[in-house]
């Protein structure tokens, strides 16, 4: 996984057909997905329950691009090795999930993965400034975490601030929540380069009509690129 700031679309399989994950992953990748985003929720840090390491390992068999695993769990550190063994390429933990995010990011890198730090809408950008040297991805939540399909919360000022803080470090700014052809360009103009989209990609399509996924991915990408 090499670093560049080109626009990347990361469909969230939380919005896919749960009965057909393998073919759904194959479909979105064939239709232009750059990363595959996997939302892990524990029913404790967030009020929903999704995928553990065995599910992520099953997804890995189908993912040919980058498997981007977003941990919405607390605690995090005890599970890092399990997600590394499951095949995560990027493992993202929330700054709000514990008191030692620096140690968590170090452990993620030590396990052979790219490290990500996520930040909720109510948390200021300054909360992660001290770990930007050991982060590969900063994930800015533009919804409160826990469920797909929520209404977008504008985080333009926060993204601009983070872009300035990051400077020339090789760190992606990823946006998670409510991304579509209207909201993605706002974030791209502020400095983001990776866009997580669940319903924005999967709405209206299926493994039988994957071209809909392709149109949705292309529309988000084109809108974001036009804002640069």
UniProtKB/Swiss-Prot annotation:
GO terms for biological process: pentose catabolic process; pentose-phosphate shunt; reductive pentose-phosphate cycle. Pathway: Carbohydrate degradation. Keywords: Calvin cycle, Carbohydrate metabolism, Isomerase, Metal-binding. Substrate binds at residues 12, 70, 146-149, 176-178, 198-199. Pfam families: Ribul_P_3_epim. Its EC number is 5.1.3.1. Binds 1 divalent metal cation per subunit. It catalyses: D-ribulose 5-phosphate = D-xylulose 5-phosphate. The active site is at 39 (proton acceptor), 176 (proton donor). GO terms for molecular function: D-ribulose-phosphate 3-epimerase activity; metal ion binding. A divalent metal cation binds at residues 37, 39, 70, 176. PROSITE patterns: RIBUL_P_3_EPIMER_1, RIBUL_P_3_EPIMER_2. CDD domains: RPE. Its cofactor is a divalent metal cation. Transmembrane segments: none annotated. Catalyzes the reversible epimerization of D-ribulose 5-phosphate to D-xylulose 5-phosphate. Belongs to the ribulose-phosphate 3-epimerase family. PANTHER family: RIBULOSE-5-PHOSPHATE-3-EPIMERASE. This is Ribulose-phosphate 3-epimerase.
């Amino acid at each position: 996984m090499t670093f560049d700031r080109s626009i990347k679309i990361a469909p969230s399989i939380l919005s896919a057909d749960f009965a057909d994950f393998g073919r759904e992953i194959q479909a979105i990748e064939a239709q232009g997905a750059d990363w595959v985003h996997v939302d892990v929720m524990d029913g404790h840090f967030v009020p929903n329950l999704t995928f553990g390491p065995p599910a992520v390992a099953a997804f890995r068999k189908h993912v040919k691009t980058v498997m981007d695993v977003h941990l919405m769990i607390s605690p995090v550190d005890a599970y890092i090795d399990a997600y590394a063994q499951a095949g995560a390429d990027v493992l993202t933990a929330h700054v709000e999930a514990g008191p030692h995010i620096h140690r968590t990011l170090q452990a993620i890198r030590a396990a052979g993965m790219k490290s990500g730090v996520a930040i909720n809408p109510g948390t200021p950008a300054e909360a992660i400034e001290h770990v930007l040297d050991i982060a590969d991805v900063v994930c800015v939540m533009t919804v409160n975490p826990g469920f797909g399909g929520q209404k977008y919360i504008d985080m333009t000022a926060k993204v601009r601030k983070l872009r300035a803080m990051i400077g020339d470090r090789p760190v992606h700014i990823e946006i998670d929540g409510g991304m579509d052809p209207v909201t993605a360009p706002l974030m791209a103009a502020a400095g983001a380069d990776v866009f997580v989209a669940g319903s924005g990609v999967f709405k209206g399509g299926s493994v039988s009509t994957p071209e809909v996924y392709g149109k949705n991915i292309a529309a988000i990408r084109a809108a974001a690129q036009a804002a640069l």
